[in-house]
Amino acid sequence: SHATKTATITPPVGEPWEESYDIIVVTAGAVTRTFPIPGVADQAIGMKNIEEAIAVRDRMLTNFEKASTLPAGPLRDRLLTFVVVGGGFAGVETYGEMRSFASSLIAQYPTLTFDDVHFHLIEAMGRIMPEVSLKTSLWVIKNLEQRGAPVHLDTQLTSAVDGKIELSTGESFESDLIVWTAGVMASPVLSNTD
């Protein structure tokens, strides 16, 4: 209780006990915040830990392998279309690294070209990386676009059901890899605390 400055500790095994405190800090971590966008919870991979980064890498490797055996068409396009949602530092860094990784993979598959691979960075605000100057943000956008990685500003993901991407601009396409970096929230462990 805050009034008595005591906390009840309830371990997984054993009896609970009271602990007094002057200041209490609860660091239960954070989880990916997906917003109520249809398909995101089922389709998107977060980017908060090494396991998620490995899942993104593995999906890219698998998609390039599969796509290299297919003729040009909708299925190959879906496998080679990569979406990152969120234009903060995590999203922009992930996006740039994915573009670089794709370029290195193209060299291993003679049936695929740079133009076969499609990237989309989706950002709801009118700029990326709000932590830096506008000049730096614009430079990063220009650099990404020169590398074949366009940025969609003032654009929201409205649906990702079954990998069918729908944007607030009316644009739609299919993707087999959606990376979600658009936010975090406190761990649900804290949902019943004051």
Residue ranges and their predicted role:
Residues 30, 88, 125:
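Short, flexible active-site-adjacent loop segments at beta-strand->alpha-helix junctions, enriched
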Residues 54, 92, 130:
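Loop/helix-junction capping segments adjacent to catalytic residues or to phosphate/diphosphate-binding pockets
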Residues 58-114:
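Rossmann-like NAD(P)H-binding beta-loop-alpha module
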